[in-house]
Each structure stands twice: as C-alpha cells, then as structure tokens.
Amino acid sequence: MVVLLLVATLVALVYYYPEKFICVDSGPVTGDVIVVLGGGLRERPVRAAELFKQHAAPRIIITGFGDDEINRQILLQNGVPASAIEVENKSQSTRDNAEFTIKLLRAEHARRVILVTSWYHSRRALKTFEHYAPDLTFYSRPSYYAFDWKDWPKHGNEHRMRMEFLKLPGYWLWYGVNPF
C-alpha cells in the first residue's frame, strides 16, 4: 500500500510539473555539433536552425529515418547552408539515433554535442546519448511549444507524455539507460 501511494505521488508530481522531470534544458551552450533527432515535428529543425544562427555549433547532424529530407529542407529554408548539414537516416528509435549518430560524432572527433528534440523527449534522449557515449559531453536544448507549463495537457501533449512515462522506465529496463 505504501509503495502504491509513493508511485501515485510520483506520477502526480510528474504529471503536474513535467518541466521539473521530463524536460531537460542545459541553457545556452556551445558545442562542436548540433544533433536534431527525427520525430516528424517541425519545431525540432527550426530550433536547430535558431541555435546554428546563434553560433552554438558550426555543424548540424539530422538523425532519423523517414523525415530526414523534410528536416534538411526546413534547415535550408531557415538559413543553414547545405555544407553545414549531415544526414543519418538509418535510425528508427531514440536508441538507434544514439547508436548511429555516435559513430559519426567519433569519426569527426566531436566532443561537445547539443541535442535538439521536443521538450517531452529531452530527458530520454539526453540520458540515452550519455549512456552510449559517456566519453562525450551532451547538452539538451529542446524545442518548446509556446504555452504556459501549467496548461500543457491542453496542447495535445497528453499522449506524448503517457508514452514518455512508459518509455523512460522501458529504456531503463531494456537498455540500462538510467533516467535520473
């Protein structure tokens, strides 16, 4: 009974304060490369282009199967030169994003990496990359919808949050990626 109460309390805290647990934002940083995780959401490459224009990093790697060309076009439309864009288009999961992109990062001797994904995906993405490449330094600069944190359920994010609530412990159990 006590365990159930503790779990219910934790779920309630995460639900009402997702920005404290789910979202990880490292704040303004510079790195060797920006990595944009795929996911079919336009705000990710737009955010990466903003960071590129702010000189956060000189290169961008797009990672993810299926939306790589769309993301490349969005980057180009937002002022990122083609010479600064590299594409990894084999990955189909966050774990794959890390596995395939880390090979590229090591081949290019990148040490400081800025990850761009959606706010609700930022913790799992950051922890997954850190798990598979503890020798590299990763920062999270997620994209945000323009809304008040207290109103996040009203913006179509409940399904995404439920999926993250399942995927965070799932990644811990299956791949050993500690979400804390």
Give names to the regions the model predicted.
Residues 14-156:
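A structural signal for short, hydrophobic/glycine-enriched beta-strand patches
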Residues 1-15:
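Hydrophobic membrane-insertion alpha-helices, especially the h-region
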Residues 13-14, 18, 171-175:
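Structural signal for membrane-spanning alpha-helices in multi-pass inner-membrane proteins
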Residues 153-180:
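A transmembrane-helix-recognition feature enriched in membrane-embedded lipid enzymes
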Residues 1, 22, 161-163:
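Detector for methionine-enriched segments
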